[in-house]
Amino acid sequence: TFEFLTGYADVYCVRYYKASGKISKHIEWMWVMFLDILFGYKDMKIINACIPLIKTNQYKGILCSTYRTFPLTAAKTLAIHTNLPFVVDLRDIIEQYASHEYISHKFHTFSWLDAFITKRFRKRLLRKRNNALEVADCVTTVSPWHVEVLKQYNPNVRLIYNGFDPELFYPQQIKTSRFIITYTGRLLSLAIRNPELLFAAIARLT
């Protein structure tokens, strides 16, 4: 994901998966998920990879940017272990979703069991996130609403709106015979991202 930074900063990759076959990849994914739920496997791998790097480099702080929870536990542990300033950047939070769109994979069990697992999973994610927020030196997020929600767990929450770096992206005027609107996000569900009103408005223009 961060390979584009190569050449500007040192980039290190922590890999969790090695399998290449379709079936073996699925089995490995299930095994890693099992280890992560029981023992925090993914966070431990990050911690073990980062401690030697921190010892041999002059880092000034730890920044963890995430949309859900992972890898906040690893970042929190490293910050406590090294006594470095700890900044958490939350672009999206679980509370903003209408349902369970924040879950990457459905559990595919019985409906009642799915509901039970999802409820427990959500509670676990929020507990781990909030534990990390409580020890953070600063929290940044993207809207006034997000700020108010996160201030329940850390009083030092700063607002930084989403945007783009003008040094990397230059606006251009491109002439075209078609009216083009580009949406670069994901339509996770109609409950929180419903484009029907936009389509209806455009239909009235044509």
Where do the language-model regions lie?
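Well-ordered beta-strand positions
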Residues: 10, 137-138, 156
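Membrane-proximal helix-turn-helix segments that form the acceptor-binding/catalytic region
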Residues: 44, 48, 70, 77-81, ...
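Short N-terminal targeting/anchoring amphipathic segment
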Residues: 50-71, 84-91
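Conserved catalytic-core segment of nucleotide-activated headgroup transferases in glycan assembly
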Residues: 165-206
